[in-house]
Design a protein with these regions (language model features):
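A bilobed periplasmic-binding-protein/Venus flytrap-type ligand-binding module shared by bacterial periplasmic
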Residues: 110-120, 251-263, 284
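Short helix-initiation/N-cap motifs at beta->coil->alpha
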Residues: 34-35, 55-69, 176-187
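A conserved helix-loop-strand patch within extracytoplasmic ligand-binding domains
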Residues: 98-150
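Short, well-ordered beta-strand elements
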Residues: 25-36, 54-59, 145-149, 271
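Ligand-binding pocket segment of bilobal, Venus flytrap-like solute-binding proteins
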Residues: 75-82, 149-228
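N-terminal segment of the mature folded domain
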Residues: 63-116
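Short, polar/charged alpha-helical segment
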Residues: 36-53, 165
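C-terminal lobe and pocket-closing loops
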Residues: 209-270, 274
Length: 316
């Protein structure tokens, strides 16, 4: 009888295991593959657990997939949505479908091209990049073409930088490199340390400006009439697009699923009041990329050090 009872008990355990989710969580936070976004995702995770008692799962996702998840109920929060990069997604999911909500608070940012001090002696503007005699200083593999990092392979901004290179004309005499950001930043460190010229895509807030004296390349101010970016859902969007001016004014905000906000209005208010500063975002980037802190460890310490502020976000 005891044997039969044990067998029945084990069968019940296995049956329950089959229907109950392992490590079930209350919400899903998308995590971008850049350091400040990784830190912010984990700060929201720890902060929400502390103030509302809900456990969040962190899922590494690009912004496009995050928006699809927000729209379909598979993702609840995206910590950094960059504009104007993702204005097409915002138009579709925020303005037209109303399935995604943007926080009213944004962090001012910018993006463009930067040069190391040695490169800036020769290359001062994007027009200089179209001069092969000047860009030969960027040639590191002796193939006759200079190299320039334009971003990580999965970033939308990387495709836009390729459009800009083609439109300005410097794409013809430069090898446009796409690699993950940590690899590129290591290359910047090495270039500055050895006095080797380097030009690369840059954005701020970012820790690289705490480490090095970089020069932002000059270019014509943004002009909507000269900035025609075809939606990335078109397979030929890069070849169909053109952009011969600087990026428009940039910012990033938190996004969350509208349905999630209705289900958890207290957390929606919390998200609406998150007010990271540019300096804080730079410190996040520095902590993860330079000090090599794990995102969850950094976030736990950040929430502890900013307990009063977290309380304020939750009470407003």
């Amino acid at each position: 009888v005891k044997t039969k009872l044990r067998i029945c008990s084990m069968a019940l355990v296995f049956a329950l295991a089959a229907v109950l989710p392992a490590g079930a969580t209350d919400l899903v936070i998308a995590m971008p593959n850049w350091p400040s976004g990784q830190a912010a995702a984990n700060i929201l995770k720890v902060g929400i657990a502390k103030k509302f008692g809900l456990e969040a799962e962190i899922q590494p996702l690009g912004t496009l997939n995050a928006f699809v998840g927000l729209d379909g109920g598979k993702v609840d929060i995206q910590p950094e949505v960059w504009r104007p990069n993702f204005d097409e997604l915002i138009k579709k999911y925020v303005t037209e479908k109303s399935t995604v909500t943007l926080s009213p608070r944004g962090v001012a940012a910018w993006q463009g091209l930067c040069a190391t001090p040695e490169a800036a002696k020769t290359i001062k503007s994007v027009s200089d990049l179209a001069d092969a005699a000047k860009t030969k200083i960027l040639d590191t593999d002796d193939d006759g073409l200079g190299e320039m990092w334009i971003g990580a392979p999965t970033w939308l901004s990387t495709g836009i930088e390729r459009v800009r290179a083609n439109s300005y004309g410097y794409g013809a005499n430069l090898t446009l490199v796409e690699v993950e950001e940590d690899v590129a930043m290591a290359a910047v460190d090495a270039a500055v340390a050895t006095g080797r010229p380097m030009v690369f895509y840059c954005y701020a807030p970012h820790h690289v400006f705490e480490l090095h004296k970089l020069v932002r390349l000059e270019e014509p101010p943004h002009d909507d009439a000269k900035w025609k970016i075809v939606p990335a859902r078109d397979p030929l969007w890069i070849s169909k697009s053109s952009a011969t001016t600087a990026w428009d004014a940039t910012e990033f905000r938190i996004a969350y699923a509208t349905a999630f906000g209705k289900k958890h209005p207290d957390i929606a208010r919390f998200l609406d009041h998150v007010d990271f500063s540019q300096e804080e975002v730079t410190k996040m980037s520095y902590a993860l990329e330079v000090e090599r802190q794990l995102p969850i460890d950094y976030a736990t310490k950040w929430v502890e050090a900013n307990a009063t502020r977290i309380d304020g976000w939750a009470k407003q």
